[in-house]
A protein has these predicted regions:
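Generic beta-sheet signal
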Residues: 62-70
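Short glycine/proline- and acidic residue-enriched helix-loop micro-motifs
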Residues: 16-42
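Generic structural signal for well-ordered alpha-helical scaffold segments
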Residues: 15, 44, 48-56
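Acidic, low-complexity terminal tails and accessory targeting/binding regions
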Residues: 1-20, 56, 60-62, 78-133
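Soluble or luminal CAZymes and related metallo-dependent hydrolases
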Residues: 6, 39-47, 93
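Short, active-site-adjacent cap segments at secondary-structure transitions
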Residues: 72-74
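Aromatic-acidic/polar surface patches that form glycan- and anion
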Residues: 3, 36, 40-43, 65-66
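Short charge-dense sequence patches
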Residues: 1-5, 28, 48-52
């Protein structure tokens, strides 16, 4: 089943809500997204690029914050653990949960914690209803 992408906020809508933002010139009234949803193979390629970038920067002794949707993060963890998301493996995460993963060296990855959400008030703790992968 082909997933159809939606346009997202357009230039006018973003500027109205966030007038201080500097927007890219190519963002127009059609919105910031103009493609269909990415395929599983496209997602896997994007996840691999991100992981390789993090590994390449592992010894810089810096902190990098990664904000991602649940599907991306599930694929990210599957890739780290050499699991195949297409074969039914998925990590379900709470909305706004935080995880700390340290890339100490290119081939040494330490997971301090995953999917913590206890900092959120109970009324804001909402899990993903289903895993799409």
């Amino acid at each position: 089943t082909k997933k159809i992408g939606k346009s997202g906020l357009n230039r006018k809508q973003i500027h109205h809500s966030f007038p201080e933002y500097v927007l890219p010139e190519d963002l127009d009234e059609k919105g910031w997204w103009n493609k269909d949803a990415e395929s599983l193979s496209e997602l896997s390629e994007r996840v691999s690029r991100v992981i390789n970038t993090l590994k390449d920067r592992a010894e810089e002794n810096i902190r990098i914050g990664l904000v991602a949707h649940g599907g991306f993060f599930s694929s990210f963890l599957c890739t780290l653990f050499n699991l195949k998301p297409a074969e039914g493996t998925a990590f379900q995460t709470y909305n706004c949960s935080i995880s700390q993963i340290t890339f100490e060296k290119r081939e040494k990855i330490v997971i301090q914690y995953l999917n913590q959400y206890d900092y959120l008030p109970k009324n804001l703790r909402v899990s993903r209803p289903k895993c799409d992968i």
